Amino acid sequence: MASTWAIQAHMDQDEPLEVKIEEEKYTTRQDWDLRKNNTHSREVFRQYFRQFCYQETSGPREALSRLRELCHQWLRPETHTKEQILELLVLEQFLTILPEELQAWVQEQHPESGEEVVTVLEDLERELDEPGEQVSAHTGEQEMFLQETVRLRKEGEPSMSLQSMKAQPKYESPELESQQEQVLDVETGNEYGNLKQEVSEEMEPHGNTSSKFENDMSKSARCGETREPEEITEEPSACSREDKQPTCDENGVSLTENSDHTEHQRICPGEESYGCDYCGKTFSQHSHLIEHQRIHTGDRPYKCEECGKAFRGRTVLIRHKIIHTGEKPYKCNECGKAFGRWSALNQHQRLHTGEKHYHCNDCGKAFSQKAGLFHHIKIHTRDKPYQCTHCNKSFSRRSILTQHQGVHTGAKPYECNECGKAFVYNSSLVSHQEIHHKEKCYQCKECGKSFSQSGLIQHQRIHTGEKPYKCDVCEKAFIQRTSLTEHQRIHTGERPYKCDKCGKAFTQRSVLTEHQRIHTGERPYKCDECGNAFRGITSLIQHQRIHTGEKPYQCDECGKAFRQRKKTSYKEILLKNHSEPQAGVNLLLSSLIPEWQSCFRKDL
């Protein structure tokens, strides 16, 4: 239904002034001219736009349509420039932040711009004998002076706005009240009397409602809810004319520059949005839509000059470049660790505060980061979507798969800046780097060797004899978890490390590396005493015991010491389990490769 809004008002000296806006069609040329040219109708349309209630419409589409119509009738974009519309918005907000007493005074002057408001206020300050001090709340002499000044200034000027009439304070003095009504009759009687305006009971009487309360009335107030006017302080220093930042008229968001106002208004209701032709998603800014559409088109126009990686948005590229520059502007106040992103610092600080906002619904475990919860959930779902193409082993996280693939490819992307040693895993590099930092070195009290904190814990098990990691198949125990993992490959037959030269496979990467030196002839480990070189570090350590005389392996029976640990023969395995022959056989078979196991089991 195409409808417009007419204005009806009635002036009566014997009763308080009330205003009602009724919905009806423009039926006369006079009404149309009023809508186009009259500044008072613009003020009424502004009020109605601000006080519009969603419940007055049949649905969201009609509500949006009416809001647009009222906004057009108020701001008139067909006749006003962007600068003029912006000035109207700033003027409205400026009048809103003024104290109530000054609002009534200023609006009676009917200013057309913010500069006129400043001029009016400065004139008032000069007329009062207290420069720089704004009018205080309802003192008798100042009230009389202000009213007399209002009357003198308004005589002979054009008509007064509805907003001013409605906001006019009601005073106890009958004489002042009579003078005020006479002024209103002179200024508004001719113009508004011709419009056949009638009094409404829905709006507040002009003597009971302040201008500020009317300007700030929320839409919910017109739907039956009430809100108390804000308390007015005597020294509104926060409302300085020079320092006040512009704010959004819809939601009160502060804006740093006036130019931000127009751009921000697109987010507010009633403004046109930009929709994606592919998925229908809408955006408040055209630039955001263009960047979003690159998801569908695959366009990545922003390319990194360092590594050639391309991105859809400029901000993502700028964030990426921090990787190359090494810039880390965000520093933790607790431990001094720096980060390239503020979000990364925010997540890191939760380690110090102990905040864990993300909880698992299955087991209740909490995490400080959303990514941690996401990966943890896969434990319950047993989801392992990332599979290795070399050995078909599956993983729950892509990062773990990437690190695992380094086992097959031989890639060691994590290199120590101090000594150049490379590692497959980042955690291994972190542990290694602690060796170079003296303040993080931990010395063994038994033998004096230095380790990282985790390395010292594992090393001390050599002296204590603790072996917490036990094999479920043969019950053999180990000091380190990695040693247990490597040992279990004996039972499973898994040999993930394969030589490219001869095809021989191994259970441990270190053994493969040492084996490959047979083909290359490389002997990187050299003895400082005699110059002998070896392919593996263990061979060098065993050799150096010849020079040092160290014999760490001692016989439990006779106490004799040896430089090397004697390998247990198959016969000794059976003899150790002579009380349980079958257990000895099973243990012996478990040490064989799977092909041999199947052959021997057939004969048993």
Curated annotation (Swiss-Prot):
Positions of region (Disordered): 154-175, 201-258
Keyword Nuclease: no
Keyword Nucleus attributed: yes
Any one cellular-component term (Gene Ontology): nucleus
Molecular function via GO: DNA-binding transcription factor activity, RNA polymerase II-specific; RNA polymerase II cis-regulatory region sequence-specific DNA binding; zinc ion binding
Assigned protein family: Belongs to the krueppel C2H2-type zinc-finger protein family.
PANTHER family documented for this protein: ZINC FINGER AND SCAN DOMAIN-CONTAINING, ZINC FINGER AND SCAN DOMAIN-CONTAINING PROTEIN 23
Name of protein: Zinc finger and SCAN domain-containing protein 12
Provenance organism: Pan paniscus
